[in-house]
Amino acid sequence: MIITKSWLNDWLELEEISSDKIAKTLNSIGIEVDRVGALKAPDKVVVGYVKEKIKHENSDKLSICQVDIGSETLQIVCGAANVDAGQFVAVATKGAIMSNGMEIKEAKLRGVDSCGMLCSSLELGFEKINEGIMLLDESIGKLELGRPLNTYEIFNDELIEVELTPNRGDCLSIYGIARDLAAALNLNLKEPKPFKESENVLGIGRILRLAAEKELNGLYNYRAIGLKEEIQTNLLLSLRLAQIEGLGKNSIENLLNYATHSTGVLFNAYDLSSFSEKDEEFTINLSKQVHGETKVSYKDKLLSFSGIFQNNESRCKDDSKIIIIEANYTDPLVIADAKIYHKDQDEKMLYRSFRGSEPKLNLGMDFLLGIFEQIPNLVIYSSSQQILTDKELPIIPISIEGISDIIGQNVDKDEVLKILKKLGFELILSGEGLINVKAPLHRPDIKNLSDICEEVVRIIGIDNIASKGLEFIEKNRLNSAYKNYIEFLNLRKRAVASGYFESLHYVLDNGEELKRLGFDSVKLKLINPITAELNTLRTTLLNHLLNAASLNAKNSKKIIKLFELGAVFNVNNQELNRIAFIHSGLKEEAKISNKAKPESVQFYDFLLDIKNIIGDFKLKSSKYNILSPYEQADIYLSDIKVGFIGRLHLKIENERDLPKTYICELDLDLIRQDFKIAKPYSKFPAITRDLSVLIPKGFEYNQIKNCIEELNLEILENFRLVDIYSDENLKEFYSITISFSFRDINKTLEDNQVNECMDKILNTLKNLGLDLR
């Protein structure tokens, strides 16, 4: 789509606005500018008048012209066949540099002095409009002899070529582009004045009648023109049409092409004399076809299919005397469906109608008649014949809040309404903050709130919308049952990965066995138990696991690692979720690394398994009758007791015929982790330090751990107990070794920083009464 600034000036006041700003504005409102170029005549090319023309004595094709340029009369030898006395022409004077780089100099042509050149449009750097030289007329402005040609707007213009998306058929005209620019630049759109009918002229009803079916998928407006002589296309229209490759040999077709490119309205011109007899009334039949398109015909002769093609036999000719001008609009969806069924197609017409031509037929017709009105020896028949169907436009309810939510920032209501009105939308204010919007007929692509938001953003400017991350808020569709399933499944997977087999048992248990293990019974007893061994609801998972382990041991299993996840009941018959583990027998299978003599499971081994399954935890001393008094502890997560762990009491091991056995039971509801704590990794190296400390026997390591943690040393990454040592020389003391790791997230640590932290740790240990070994 090609436009020029001067052409836009016909619709908008753009004298004070640069082409660069116009291009930037078009880009910002979604009309992509491909290129901007200057259209300027060379300097030292002026308006001249051919006073006299005589034939060159020594040439059949050359003429000697006396050309008045105001300040002087130049003798110019010209070879153009169309030059003649009485013409206004473009004269390149001495020193002018033409578009091809040629400099005009005084010269002799076949022995005759020539002091300049009469120019064609092509020689001036414009598109070719005719054979020979370019003849000037006052369509470009008042002709003044000697006036530089590039002081006329058409010869000092700027061309802008834009690329349009298929949905923007409304911008396939100067008027359509100007309409969007008016909204973006807050300018008033200049529309053509309504055509004023002349008095004492025949009405169109004398020569034309319409016969139309109801419910046509289009709009139609007809006018009649009487021609007394062949008309010519003026210079302004010729230059503009040549720029858009729309200049032809037929002047009527040229005027229609110009009006279409200017307004977007589609036109057809029918030669009345080609079909009807003299003094016969011309009846145009409009009929709706099977695919929705409209057939325009006269008797049995096809004139056109609206928006698809026009029959060549119906077109106007240079000698046409009466022509019927048809302005038409067809729903682009109808064109899209129907065009594939027509072998004959007008590609230029289809390009517009398929995307949506301008439906304001009166605007286009008034514009065209305004051009015809300036042509002498021409009669415009009064009145018009029209077929206007009321198409019900869809109503789109919108709210300013809804628009603001989609755009991502608050927008002013008055600004939104102003933009939509400028773009031709019909607005109906309703209650509760809603606005009912009807998209104009020239915007069939506007169908919902999002489309309207896009229009608002286009005009406001995407660069004026604050950047904001798109936030997706999805409703949580996971219920508690599914969450429990996933959490329990993950626990099972980790337990299996640690070598444990899952065991499943009834929720019923043996009340006597539970009592011997030290577990309370539920208050409510079973009235009719299945068996004597299953006579109560279980209060722990461990009894079943011990029985299962005992059975496995009796079947010569050397490594017994079992777990069970399920429900238990407290003394008040409330259901609780628990998970229990048991590791009985050997630590591992016999293999080369242990010389086929694997050790029995140790407390530390069992603790590592539980850590791998539930994560880090703390231990505190405990007292359970079911456990060995020397190897047992309560398990804490975030200072909350979640269960216990330890070695099964030797007495119970013997009663159940079990080898060395460790057990653990945890409250599932307390070990859940509803969130993950993520920390960045440091790319800098760690520095380690070890301390060996003497502690009295019976002194809890947790006291040391808690005191060090309370120091809140920023660079202390972690610390752990790595060794416990005792011998006769230490008597009532143990020697423990603690390893400390220091690291900074932002830089490499220096020794003095680490030493400072170690001094604080040593002072803390001294406050506990502990000394270095």
Curated annotation (Swiss-Prot):
It comes from the Bacteria. The keyword Protein biosynthesis applies. GO terms for biological process: phenylalanyl-tRNA aminoacylation. SMART domains: B3_4, B5, FDX-ACB. Keywords: Aminoacyl-tRNA synthetase, ATP-binding, Cytoplasm, Ligase, Magnesium, Metal-binding, Nucleotide-binding, Protein biosynthesis, RNA-binding, tRNA-binding. Residues 391-467 form the B5 domain. One of its GO terms (cellular component) is phenylalanine-tRNA ligase complex. It is found in: Cytoplasm. PROSITE patterns: B5 (PS51483), FDX_ACB (PS51447), TRBD (PS50886). Binds 2 magnesium ions per tetramer. Residues 39-150 form the tRNA-binding domain. Its cofactor is Mg(2+). It catalyses: tRNA(Phe) + L-phenylalanine + ATP = L-phenylalanyl-tRNA(Phe) + AMP + diphosphate + H(+). CDD domains: PheRS_beta_core (cd00769), tRNA_bind_bactPheRS (cd02796). Mg(2+) binds at D445, D451, E454, E455. Residues 682-773 form the FDX-ACB domain. SUPFAM superfamilies: Anticodon-binding domain of PheRS, Class II aaRS and biotin synthetases, Nucleic acid-binding proteins, PheT/TilS domain, Putative DNA-binding domain. Pfam families: B3_4 (PF03483), B5 (PF03484), FDX-ACB (PF03147), tRNA_bind (PF01588), tRNA_synthFbeta (PF17759). GO terms for molecular function: ATP binding; magnesium ion binding; phenylalanine-tRNA ligase activity; tRNA binding. Its EC number is 6.1.1.20. Tetramer of two alpha and two beta subunits. Belongs to the phenylalanyl-tRNA synthetase beta subunit family. Type 1 subfamily. This is Phenylalanine--tRNA ligase beta subunit. It comes from Campylobacter jejuni subsp. jejuni serotype O:2 (strain ATCC 700819 / NCTC 11168).
